[in-house]
Amino acid sequence: MAAKTKKAIVDSKKQFDAIKKQFETFQILNEKGEVVNEAAMPDLTDDQLKELMRRMVFTRVLDQRSISLNRQGRLGFYAPTAGQEASQIATHFALEKEDFVLPGYRDVPQLIWHGLPLYQAFLFSRGHFRGNQMPDDVNALSPQIIIGAQYIQTAGVALGLKKRGKKAVAITYTGDGGASQGDFYEGINFAGAYKAPAIFVVQNNRYAISTPVEKQSAAETIAQKAVAAGIVGVQVDGMDPLAVYAATAEARERAINGEGPTLIETLTFRYGPHTMAGDDPTKYRTKEIENEWEQKDPLVRFRAFLENKGLWSEEEEAKVIEDAKEEIKQAIKKADAEPKQKVTDLMKIMYEKMPHNLEEQFEIYTQKESK
């Protein structure tokens, strides 16, 4: 029989309290758009602040139109983004063109702002192979559908950038559910061991489809999981674009200076369903919770901040919305005009030099498609 110790070896309360204090939520703008952390204000010009707002407004319009197009049967798979604009757009706003983006399936907006033509984003939703072909000058992979798998890929891409002497980072995104996957831990551990220039963004929107974050992990925060991998972790108000930008900009600077990766947890909320494939949020979250997070809308918050500085107006936002709708209209027209994909198209892009057995199949399908 094991002997009992007179005193606990580990003071669990002290340990957990220390972790909680270490990962307090970083915020610059409160829900009213007021600056509550002047010392942390990022060095952005007025034009840059307006551009950040323009991109967020465009992304909200894109989400609304994409939902409408999906309901019309003109788009296929779609994961709504409303509510997560600060977490998505402000992180990307801190990047440079040479940085490498590895998105999840909800992160198409970041790809668009990184250079993916909008019409190709629509083709991706339709399952057309052209939607997965990044232009040569766009450093990115197409959205990862396997939850969390992009974390391992990001560690590898980041290490490659380091070995090539590039002053660039690899950044990836997942939700809170992705942080429960084994690939998540492998990715941050590998990146930490090799001090790879990576940024891991976990958009904690509170639900892994329908599973609340409290039932996914006993950890007080997702950010604290960085400690086990020996990397920096930070929890950010994911509805505050300035806080999200500042945290990402600092993480990027640290990475390119050889100080290793960062795990950023953004506290955010998706206003819509998990995807447009039949998910009903009313089955697993209350109206009270939805109302609480609607009061934290990143666009409302940032709009108030900019209006207070005299940098934004209703007229200016209306113009952005009008331009966005027209750009989306033209992009969907271009997507509609894309030739229907054929089996031979898919076979052509599989190998640089087609194997003999596929050459035979290629000829068979070529004849079928010519009829």
UniProtKB/Swiss-Prot annotation:
Known EC number: 1.2.4.1
Pfam (any one): E1_dh
Subunit text: Heterodimer of an alpha and a beta chain.
Record entry for activity regulation: Activity of the E1 module is inhibited by the pyruvate dehydrogenase inhibitor PdhI.
Cofactor: thiamine diphosphate
UniProt xrefs under NCBIfam families: PDH_E1_alph_x
Function (record text): The pyruvate dehydrogenase complex catalyzes the overall conversion of pyruvate to acetyl-CoA and CO(2). It contains multiple copies of three enzymatic components: pyruvate dehydrogenase (E1), dihydrolipoamide acetyltransferase (E2) and lipoamide dehydrogenase (E3).
Keyword tags: Oxidoreductase, Pyruvate, Thiamine pyrophosphate
Gene that this polypeptide is encoded by: pdhA
SUPFAM superfamilies per the UniProt record, alphabetical: Thiamin diphosphate-binding fold (THDP-binding)
GO BP annotations listed: pyruvate decarboxylation to acetyl-CoA
Name of the protein: Pyruvate dehydrogenase E1 component subunit alpha
Molecular function per GO: pyruvate dehydrogenase (acetyl-transferring) activity
Catalyzed reactions: N(6)-[(R)-lipoyl]-L-lysyl-[protein] + pyruvate + H(+) = N(6)-[(R)-S(8)-acetyldihydrolipoyl]-L-lysyl-[protein] + CO2
Organism: Bacillus subtilis (strain 168)
Cross-referenced InterPro entries: Alpha-ketoacid_DH_E1_comp (IPR050771), DH_E1 (IPR001017), PdhA/BkdA (IPR017596), THDP-binding (IPR029061)
